[in-house]
Amino acid sequence: MDGVTYQRFPTVKIRELKDDYAKFELRETDVSMANALRRVMISEVPTMAIHLVKIEVNSSVLNDEFIAQRLSLIPLTSERAMSMRFCQDCEDCNGDEHCEFCSVEFPLSAKCVTDQTLDVTSRDLYSADPTVTPVDFTSNSSTSDSSEHKGIIIAKLRRGQELKLKALARKGIGKDHAKWSPAATVTYMYEPDIIINEEMMNTLTDEEKIDLIESSPTKVFGIDPVTGQVVVVDPEAYTYDEEVIKKAEAMGKPGLIEIHPKHDSFVFTVESTGALKASQLVLNAIDILKQKLDAIRLSDNTVEADDQFGELGAHMREG
């Protein structure tokens, strides 16, 4: 349509950032962009994960398939995954074999020779590539208990039992299998816009104000110790339950508090599995989203693009 523009200039403000956790604000955009970013982070940012397992010896109580499943779900450091090739696209091995450009080999050999149970963990996997290794959670742990730093348990062996195998990690995305998803949790919420009618609030007694505040299941409101006025303490604690609004109506004060979501402002919470740092996960997702949009813009097959993306696809090709 003439005169319609989709152009926006989103802004990002980081609130909290750790290796495995990020919280940030995404503003000046709409829910379609927020949801697209969330979905890309969960299912389309590539990582490395164990895909093939050749078991040579297994005398543990676990069958081969169970061990292979456990191995596949061990998160691997994947900073290099974006530059590696998918096995089906690898020109050096044609996807039938494996090479350094698309795969990483992990041999494992463990045998229990004492009466004490031997824990076989992710630390017993030896990587052929030092940039792709089982995630070490030691740096993220605040406890000094050494038992917390032994890695992810694969199997337990008793005297005489042995486990020997070769595992092959390949590049993939969460859309194909959850083992390749770098995200433990990705959520976003609308920022609430909370408006208090001060004139109506002044007509309430102190007891009524306390009842109003306590009607909210989360601590959104409080009383200013100096002025005695009801104030917003933590707007993001609001869960859109409308309990405080219903309470105001029950008190005969409709419109006392109005709460509306800001449809162009979102608060994201991102937790990583450890395969990627949370910050890198977000940046990689943005890069992939850009590539998808560029593919629409540069599409030669306009009919196919229009079928898939309709007016938006046509608009982007026109610039």
UniProtKB/Swiss-Prot annotation:
<dbReference type="Pfam" id="PF01000">
    <property type="entry name" value="RNA_pol_A_bac"/>
</dbReference>
<keyword id="KW-0007">Acetylation</keyword>
<dbReference type="GO" id="GO:0000418">
    <property type="term" value="C:RNA polymerase IV complex"/>
</dbReference>
<comment type="function">
    <text>DNA-dependent RNA polymerase catalyzes the transcription of DNA into RNA using the four ribonucleoside triphosphates as substrates. Component of RNA polymerases IV and V which mediate short-interfering RNAs (siRNA) accumulation and subsequent RNA-directed DNA methylation-dependent (RdDM) transcriptional gene silencing (TGS) of endogenous repeated sequences, including transposable elements.</text>
</comment>
<protein>
    <recommendedName>
        <fullName>DNA-directed RNA polymerases IV and V subunit 3B</fullName>
    </recommendedName>
</protein>
<comment type="subunit">
    <text>Component of the RNA polymerase IV and V complexes. Interacts with NRPB11, SHH1, GRP23 and NRPD1.</text>
</comment>
<dbReference type="InterPro" id="IPR001514">
    <property type="entry name" value="DNA-dir_RNA_pol_30-40kDasu_CS"/>
</dbReference>
<feature type="modified residue" description="N-acetylmethionine">
    <location>
        <position position="1"/>
    </location>
</feature>
<dbReference type="InterPro" id="IPR036643">
    <property type="entry name" value="RNApol_insert_sf"/>
</dbReference>
<dbReference type="InterPro" id="IPR022842">
    <property type="entry name" value="RNAP_Rpo3/Rpb3/RPAC1"/>
</dbReference>
<dbReference type="GO" id="GO:0000419">
    <property type="term" value="C:RNA polymerase V complex"/>
</dbReference>
<keyword id="KW-0240">DNA-directed RNA polymerase</keyword>
<dbReference type="GO" id="GO:0006351">
    <property type="term" value="P:DNA-templated transcription"/>
</dbReference>
<comment type="similarity">
    <text>Belongs to the archaeal Rpo3/eukaryotic RPB3 RNA polymerase subunit family.</text>
</comment>
<dbReference type="Pfam" id="PF01193">
    <property type="entry name" value="RNA_pol_L"/>
</dbReference>
<dbReference type="InterPro" id="IPR011262">
    <property type="entry name" value="DNA-dir_RNA_pol_insert"/>
</dbReference>
<dbReference type="InterPro" id="IPR036603">
    <property type="entry name" value="RBP11-like"/>
</dbReference>
<keyword id="KW-0804">Transcription</keyword>
<keyword id="KW-0539">Nucleus</keyword>
<dbReference type="GO" id="GO:0046983">
    <property type="term" value="F:protein dimerization activity"/>
</dbReference>
<dbReference type="GO" id="GO:0003899">
    <property type="term" value="F:DNA-directed RNA polymerase activity"/>
</dbReference>
<dbReference type="GO" id="GO:0003677">
    <property type="term" value="F:DNA binding"/>
</dbReference>
<dbReference type="InterPro" id="IPR011263">
    <property type="entry name" value="DNA-dir_RNA_pol_RpoA/D/Rpb3"/>
</dbReference>
<dbReference type="InterPro" id="IPR050518">
    <property type="entry name" value="Rpo3/RPB3_RNA_Pol_subunit"/>
</dbReference>
